[in-house]
Amino acid sequence: MPKPALQILPDALLAAYLEQVPSGLQEAFDALQEAEISTPDFSFYTSVASVFSSKIEGEEIDLDSYIKHKKFGIAFLPDYTQKIDDLYSAYIFAQTNPLNQQNIAEAHKRLSRHLIPQQYQGRLRTHNMYVSTPDGRIEYVAASPYIVAQEMDKLYNDISYLLKKEMRIEEVFFYASLLHLVFVKIHPWNDGNGRSARLLEKWFLAQKLGEKAWLAQSEKMYYQQHAGYYNNIRMLGLEYPELVSDRKRIFYFQCRSSKPTNLIIADVIIRD
């Protein structure tokens, strides 16, 4: 019996999602433009993505300081800029390489250079993992290390299938958010999972829609709404098996939360 085209990403409520997408998405996307401050050697919007994705993870850096560092070469203490530089490098790599299993691992190697020891960079974890809140509560438990490889194989299958599939721009946003969500719930790396998930979402958008996707300030919006971002993830249940056994949780996450995560980036583009 042949395997289903999609092995891990549910799409049963795609139609319900499409009813909520704001109008004018394609026109707004087409109108995105690079910032005047950008040069061949410096990307303003890649800096925005790197700074705010890092701030979600607790890095203490502001955009103005990072631009001074990245564009004008102003020196800061290494601890202030190293991890953001690493993530910037991963974004630049993604912008010039196809989205596939090998390159996802390479992007993680780049963004995790100052997060984890070299032997764990770009390699799937082999131990239990959970995400905790600042007050010590368990936010959610990631996939068991015994199934991480098989779950990621399913995700890579779905990425490959979706990259070949013709779809409307609204559908692209739907699947991009699902990739982000399922990746972060699997939590395949020892560290750098959130950064990787946000990069993966935008990488998929760019592969399907073109390089203008890199100009969307989705990471900034996720940071500005990070409480809702984590509240939505919390709706999916504490344990990873709850995610895969009750797909209605994903649909609730997508279609009924006060600010569905897969509409945030669409809102960003239209409002910009």
PLM ranges: what are they?
Residues 1-272:
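FIC/Doc superfamily catalytic core
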